[in-house]
Amino acid sequence: MSSSQTRFLLLYGSQRGQAKAIAEEIAVKASDHGFAAEVSCLSEEEKYNLERERSPVVIVVSTTGDGEPPDTAINFVKKIKTKTLCSVHFAHLHYALLGLGDSNYSNFCNCGKTIDKRLGELGAQQFYASGYADDGVGLELVVEPWIEGLWDALRKFVTSAMSTSQKDTNNHVGDHNAKNEMRTIESAVTDLNLHLLSLDESSSKDESGGSCNIVAEGEVLEASLTRSVSPLSESSLNVPALPAPFLDVELLNELQQDPTLLKPPETAHQVVITSAKQLTREDAVKTTLLLEMDISETPLVYEPGDSFDLLCPNNNSEVEELLLRLGILEKKHHIVKLQVKPDTKRKVSRLPLYIPEHSSLQYIFMWCLEIRAIPKKAFLRSLVEYTTNEHEKRRLQELCSKQGFADYNHFIRNPSLSILDLLCAFPSCMPTLSVILEHLPKLQPRSYSAASSIYSNPGRVHIVFNIVEFPPCPERPALRKGVCTGWLSNLVLPILQHSGGQMMLPEIQDASNVLPKVYICSRPSSAFHLPSDTAAPIIMVGPGTGISPFIGFLQHRKKQREEHPDVSFGETWLFFGCRHKDRDFIFRDELGRFQAEGTLTHLRVSFSRDQDDSTEEVKPKYVQDNLRLNAQDVVRVLFKENGYIYICGDAKNMAKNVHEELIDIFSRELQIDKLEAMKVIADLREKKRYLQDIWS
């Protein structure tokens, strides 16, 4: 650290690397503004001590699951929530916090808000207003202006602290000035966020989502991924600083063994897929598969409500297409040697830990890199330097600029474009391998809820999923399947049993030699489990594949009832929904059996596409409609009988709609206003009686 640079502590808590990447970006930019960031993960408690920290502290933290801290922040949150800490425990601490979340989830940025609130309760003071970035609309809309404002806030704080120290200013006056500065900063951030919001709203007024110019009478020129129109095409641009390169890449000799064999982490276990069944009819809108995996030879155990991370590769043809586009396909079997550039200007630079040594080029692109990741603006800024066509170079500059944020969202973020899509759209762009490796994030495992109970299926676990499809669009003309679901559907094709049909394995001595194998890791849930009190009633809301954990719940409850006939068991309500009764009513027969034997006491099903317009009878279309029709029972179960409600499925639409419907139900049935109803839900959450397993 230069003697002229002012130190601050930079902490991050990250689940999938976004908070870490943003913290590293802040650290890189710090030196340009006269600061030196000392970076640590929140889990690295041996590297920092907030009890003794006198420098400013900046915290970047994400939220995972149903408002839970990322794994790397769990101990930190638990530590600061210790009830024995006094109200001035952190009175010496001055901090700024940037929270990352997704507004598709009801507990938006909950980890960041929890840390923020608790630090305040312990006497810590903000020197800069907290920012909460929304991945649902684009993290950069808040992250970029928040980082820009951070440097002035740090300078003001350092100047104020030095002035206070030198003049021994009266504490009351100092507090008053600090509050005024805080209001000024909060006002500036609020104004900036409102400005961004107004820009975003105005840019979306055109139905196409982009701008358009009238070139001649009757002819309209519209913006596209590769073309801009006025005013953007004529604007001066504020583009991000060019990220400093930090990797040296060398291709060595060819790898002799199979270059695509996975080198699994220690926590992963290889398991055999013993069966695969299609649960939906061939004419269903989505294809749903159920897989059974044999975990009997592993130490893995689980409870209904837990999940499993499944390690999956990128599509091989997609990998080869990308390598071909980069001009290195013929070297796909060569070993890649990585080193940090000795002369890099990047302050925080290290080799990617997710790329093993002595890996082939093909292996790295198949198993290590998220090649489907939406390229961030910093990536686009780097691509500009490798683009020779002036028109293409200008367009990439626009897409990564402040002025082009609406076009970036509309043409890159919303259609979920990948680096391959961009390189196909901008043919004169020829980035080096090092640039690709520097910017592509780690390929993440995909998480699936257990759709079974280990007590009903010893040594086995079931998962259920839809085969995800991304339809063609102007920016990506070819249909694509989900990275994991597309791979799994091809992997199990030889053993797939279609709905209503039978699948016969070949007569062989050892079926495990021909059955497909995958690597999985256990991902226990902290709370999404059946109540320990079997007499407590439960309400389960799970349309589509959201029913998965509830099949495990019901299998588990059935086994409990069989083994403990004298024990009291509470009501079980299931609200399920799908499009068509005859096409995608998955687990229909099993639910019928659960009902017949009394394990499932109430089943309410809605079919969104089977509405009969010829009759006046209005049938429930979605799960929230059935909740409304059973409002009195919902209130009785939750409040008179202290029951639990579980919600599983799509966060963006279903979970939000169910949440809003419950607010209406509580308001109406309990005769309270909506604000009080929201507090009621918050109380249920706090007591772990309103639980969600949702995804976007």
Regions found by a protein language model. Give the residues of each.
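FNR-like FAD-binding dehydrogenase module
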Residues: M1-S696
